[in-house]
C-alpha cells in the first residue's frame, strides 16, 4: 500500500498510566495496516514542525480503526494527549515493513513475542496476527502495567519489572531464564539494550529473531537519512552498509544489523 496523508478522526482516547495514552483513530489507513508498521501523526501547533512516528498497536479493519498507545515525551505528544473524541487530526501511513508473520507456518511453533516499555504496544497486533504457541514476554519499570489484559487474550503473558513489584525482577531476558523458556522464533520491540540482549541470545541459541528498532525519526519516509542503522550488507551503489529504519525497517532480522 502506498503511503498517504489524510485527515482522520479521534474515536476515543484514555490515559492508561501516568504519561501513557491510548487513542483509537478512524482512518482508511487501517485497511492494509500490518503488525509492526507505524503512522506519522501531525501536531496542529505550527511551531511543532515535524510529525511524530507512532507504532500501530491494534487494527480493526472492519471499522477502519487504528489504535496507537504512546508515551508523552515532548511537545508534540503532549498535544496529542489533549485530543478529544471527534477531533480531526492529520496522519500519514502506513509506514515501515512490519513483522514477517509469514515466517511462522506451523501452529505448533513456539514464538517469543517480546516487548519492553513503549515497545509493548506493537506486540498486541502481532499477537493477534499469529496462530501458534505464543509466549508474550513483556518488561515494565514497575507495577504501572498497561495492555496486560489485552495481551492475555492472545497468549500466555510473562511479566518482568525492574523493581520486582510484578513477575520476575529484572528484564525480559531474566524472565526467560527464570522460567526456563525455549522458543523456535523471536519477535521483539523495545529499547536498544533489550534488543542487543535478545540479538546475542538468539545468535547463541541459533533462533531466528526479528527486532523492531526504536529510533527518532524526522521525515518517516526515508528522505532525510536521520534514522540509519548499520547492516552487514553493503549497498552496491553507495558502498555503505547503512539501512534506513523508517523505510527498510523498522523490523530487521537480528543477525543482519549491528546494534
Residue ranges with predicted function:
Residues 2-85:
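Ferredoxin-reductase
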Residues 12, 58, 159-161, 211, ...:
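Structural signal for conserved beta-strand scaffold positions within catalytic alpha/beta enzyme cores
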Residues 77-216:
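FNR/FR-type flavoprotein reductase catalytic core
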Residues 122, 215-250:
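Local cysteine-cluster metal-coordination motifs and their immediate loop/turn environment
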Residues 256:
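Short metal-binding segments enriched for Cys and/or His
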Amino acid at each position: 500500500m502506498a503511503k498517504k496523508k489524510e485527515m482522520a478522526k479521534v474515536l476515543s482516547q484514555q490515559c492508561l498510566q501516568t504519561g501513557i495514552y491510548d487513542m483509537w483513530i478512524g482512518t482508511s489507513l487501517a485497511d492494509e495496516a500490518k503488525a509492526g508498521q507505524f503512522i506519522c501523526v501531525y501536531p496542529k501547533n505550527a511551531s511543532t514542525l515535524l510529525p511524530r512516528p507512532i507504532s500501530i498497536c491494534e487494527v480493526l479493519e472492519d471499522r477502519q480503526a487504528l489504535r496507537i498507545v504512546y508515551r508523552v515525551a515532548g511537545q508534540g505528544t503532549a498535544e496529542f494527549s489533549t485530543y478529544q473524541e471527534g477531533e480531526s487530526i492529520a496522519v500519514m501511513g502506513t509506514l515501515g515493513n512490519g513483522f514477517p508473520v509469514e515466517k511462522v507456518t506451523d501452529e505448533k511453533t513456539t514464538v517469543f513475542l517480546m516487548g519492553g516499555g513503549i515497545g509493548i504496544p506493537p506486540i498486541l497486533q502481532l499477537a493477534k496476527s499469529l496462530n501458534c504457541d505464543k509466549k508474550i514476554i513483556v518488561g515494565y519499570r514497575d507495577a504501572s502495567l498497561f495492555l496486560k489484559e489485552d495481551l492475555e487474550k492472545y497468549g500466555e503473558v510473562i511479566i518482568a519489572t525492574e523493581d520486582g513489584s510484578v513477575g520476575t525482577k529484572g528484564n525480559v531476558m531474566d524472565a526467560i531464564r527464570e522460567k526456563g523458556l525455549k522458543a523456535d522464533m523471536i519477535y521483539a520491540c523495545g529499547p536498544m539494550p533489550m534488543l542487543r540482549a535478545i540479538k546475542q541470545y538468539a545468535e547463541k541459541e541459533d533462533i531466528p529473531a526479528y527486532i523492531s528498532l526504536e529510533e527518532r525519526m524526522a521525515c518517516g519516509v526515508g528522505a532525510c537519512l536521520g534514522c540509519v542503522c548499520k547492516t552487514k550488507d553493503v549497498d552496491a551503489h553507495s558502498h555503505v552498509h547503512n539501512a534506513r529504519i523508517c523505510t527498510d525497517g523498522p523490523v530487521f532480522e537480528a543477525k543482519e544489523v549491528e546494534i
